[in-house]
From Swiss-Prot:
The gene is EXO70. One of its GO terms (biological process) is exocyst assembly. The keyword Transport applies. Belongs to the EXO70 family. It comes from the Eukaryota. It is found in: Bud; Bud neck. Transmembrane segments: none annotated. Its main location: other. Disulfide bonds: none annotated. GO terms for molecular function: phosphatidylinositol-4,5-bisphosphate binding; small GTPase binding. Keywords: Exocytosis, Protein transport, Transport. This is Exocyst complex protein EXO70.
Amino acid sequence: MPSIDVDEADILILSDGLKQVNELTREITGSLSKITSTTSKSSKLFAPIIETNTRLNVLKRNIESSFDSVSSIKDLASDASKYEIILEQEITQVGLRKFIKTLHKVDDIMDDLREKSKSTADFRGIVTHLEELTMIGEKNLQIYFANKLNQIQPFDPQVYMNKKQNFPYYYDEDLNDIAAILDYFGDTEQNPVTEIFMKQQGQLVLNSLAFLEPFTKQITSESNVPYQRGSSGFNSYTEAFITFVSGVSVLIDDVFVKLPDRRPAVFCKIVAPILHNYTKILRYNIDLVKDDINNYGLFSFELSENINRVHQLFKGKPLQNNEQLLECEAELKSISESLFKDLIQYIGQKTASLAQLPTDNGVTEATVDVMSRLRKFSEYKSGCLATIQSMTRESWLPNESKNVWTISMTPKNAQQLLSCFFSDAIDYLTISLERKAQKILNPNLEPEVGAPHKRIPQMQRIGFFVLTNITLIEQIVQRSEINTVLEDIGAARLVKLNARYVNYFASDWRDLASNLLDQVFVDSSGKISSKDKDQVKEKFRKFNEGFEQLVSNYKTCRITDPAMKKLLKQEIFALVAPMYERFHNRYKDSFKNPRKHIKYTPNELMNILNSLGR
């Protein structure tokens, strides 16, 4: 047996072991490949299962969340269903308070749902439905609101003013309903019911005033006819306007009880168009006055009175300084101020047109005309006062000497100034009549008016003529508003004026009596000299002749006014009787045959003088 090398044998054994290891490695590698392949296939199979399982878990959580949401709004949904039934009914059936309360509760439900932002996304349909339900409910509320307001429809204000009745107004229950609805919608700029309120009230007033507007388009029914106080339709329009605006103000206070800050804006929105229309009609009437100032001039005072009333209406309220109204007021003031001077100028022109004195030295047509105008002037006292307060006396006084006026003081206030104007007008009328009488009776002499102490030819006749006209003036003053305008200071001026022309009338009687004032000296024995006796005889003769002539002249005067007749008799008696009695008693025993020179005893003279007053 051949020998085997040990090293070779080790190599053979090692090689054989390596072969076995390689074979085993190949088998392991093959097994691992199979495992890897199987693992890959398993992974692909389990991925969808895991994904599905994940989705199922998410869905489970969503379902659980939904169940939680449904559970949380179960009660809200139940309440909403009940409220929906209420809101679908008529407000008159449900009752306004319950209807509004239900709307508030629905709004609360929506607030709760909106707070649950995640849940709301799943129940958007419920929220949308509730929003639509609220919109319908609020729309019905607006309709109900409008129907409440429309219970008062446009009406003719004149019907109520003629009957002295209040304009229609809402009952307390209706006011409470209107206020409740306004309060529900709250204080917002786009508040729909506030808009409804403002529009409805504005149209109600404008459409009601439209009944009166046609009567504001003319001042008198016929052209070229003087305006009669109170006859213009604009007065009724103003009265209704003031009543309506006052009513709107009261209504706003009544229904905006819980929204006081909204009142001024609401008032302006309603009243501004109404005031605009008023000023437009006012402007139209001012233009009518300007077109015929002679007939319609005094109407400007009435328009001013109306404006003053409107100013009082808006005092302390919005719109109190309305520009259009202030412009109309300024223009009217200018027109009214011109009337004062125009009347004074008219007096001068009217008296200057006299061609001759009345045959009975009586009342002239000029006096009647002027006093008629002055009487009408006095009917607008408040308008005159408003105008004259910014004027001065010099603005109407004509160019006359200061001594012709019965007063020289400067008035301190509007009332005194107005009294002064009327007295100045009466003064100017009388001195103008006197001036014209002097020109007619003494054409060759320059007139000197208002000067009772100067000797003017035919002074008694002039005095009687003016006094006759003053008598009519006094009668008109007493029977008209002139009396209240004049007040005490004006009445005193009229007395002074009357006294001036009584002095005119009594001037010849005064001269007659003054003739008895000449000094004749009697000696201590009571005798007078022959020369002085002749003077006394002459004085008695002149007195007798003058007295008879003056009595005759007096009787030719047709004095029909008892007061004037009494006044003149008293004046003459006071001038003549005491002086004659003193002279008579002093010299009655100076003659052997007194009756030859002394025609009247004091008693006989007094009887004649007293007869003048009968």
